[in-house]
């Protein structure tokens, strides 16, 4: 395994650890999710470029589309929660409440 792949996997693990440790604020959770998606995008792109597998060349672009949709939904949820409650705490998100 090359050093580049190990660095990308380390970036993914650090983002995952940040998501698990700093989950009190919604903004920090969204930033960790974006870091995970970025490392997955770079890993998928490098893997496809190194293996010359041209049939899967659309997969990183599709992953980028999903990451953009996730970011838009996360930011709209952040705006809604901060306007409603005044803070961006994750504990304010109660899905059982009507």
From Swiss-Prot:
<keyword id="KW-0679">Respiratory chain</keyword>
<keyword id="KW-0249">Electron transport</keyword>
<keyword id="KW-0812">Transmembrane</keyword>
<keyword id="KW-0830">Ubiquinone</keyword>
<keyword id="KW-0472">Membrane</keyword>
<keyword id="KW-1133">Transmembrane helix</keyword>
<feature type="transmembrane region" description="Helical">
    <location>
        <begin position="1"/>
        <end position="21"/>
    </location>
</feature>
<keyword id="KW-0813">Transport</keyword>
<dbReference type="GO" id="GO:0005743">
    <property type="term" value="C:mitochondrial inner membrane"/>
</dbReference>
<dbReference type="GO" id="GO:0042773">
    <property type="term" value="P:ATP synthesis coupled electron transport"/>
</dbReference>
<dbReference type="InterPro" id="IPR001133">
    <property type="entry name" value="NADH_UbQ_OxRdtase_chain4L/K"/>
</dbReference>
<protein>
    <recommendedName>
        <fullName>NADH-ubiquinone oxidoreductase chain 4L</fullName>
        <ecNumber>7.1.1.2</ecNumber>
    </recommendedName>
</protein>
<keyword id="KW-0520">NAD</keyword>
<feature type="transmembrane region" description="Helical">
    <location>
        <begin position="61"/>
        <end position="81"/>
    </location>
</feature>
<dbReference type="InterPro" id="IPR039428">
    <property type="entry name" value="NUOK/Mnh_C1-like"/>
</dbReference>
<dbReference type="GO" id="GO:0008137">
    <property type="term" value="F:NADH dehydrogenase (ubiquinone) activity"/>
</dbReference>
<keyword id="KW-0999">Mitochondrion inner membrane</keyword>
<feature type="transmembrane region" description="Helical">
    <location>
        <begin position="29"/>
        <end position="49"/>
    </location>
</feature>
<dbReference type="Pfam" id="PF00420">
    <property type="entry name" value="Oxidored_q2"/>
</dbReference>
<comment type="similarity">
    <text>Belongs to the complex I subunit 4L family.</text>
</comment>
<dbReference type="GO" id="GO:0045271">
    <property type="term" value="C:respiratory chain complex I"/>
</dbReference>
<keyword id="KW-1278">Translocase</keyword>
<comment type="function">
    <text>Core subunit of the mitochondrial membrane respiratory chain NADH dehydrogenase (Complex I) which catalyzes electron transfer from NADH through the respiratory chain, using ubiquinone as an electron acceptor. Part of the enzyme membrane arm which is embedded in the lipid bilayer and involved in proton translocation.</text>
</comment>
<keyword id="KW-0496">Mitochondrion</keyword>
<comment type="subunit">
    <text>Core subunit of respiratory chain NADH dehydrogenase (Complex I) which is composed of 45 different subunits.</text>
</comment>
């Amino acid at each position: 395994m090359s050093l580049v792949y190990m660095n990308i996997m380390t970036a993914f693990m650090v983002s995952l650890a940040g998501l698990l440790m700093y989950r009190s604020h919604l903004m920090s959770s969204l930033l960790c999710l974006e870091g995970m998606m970025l490392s997955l995008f770079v890993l998928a792109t490098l893997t496809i470029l190194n293996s010359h597998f041209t049939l899967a060349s659309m997969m990183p672009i599709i992953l980028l589309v999903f990451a953009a949709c996730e970011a838009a939904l996360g930011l709209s949820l952040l705006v809604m929660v901060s306007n409603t409650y005044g803070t961006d705490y994750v504990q304010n998100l109660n899905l059982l409440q009507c």
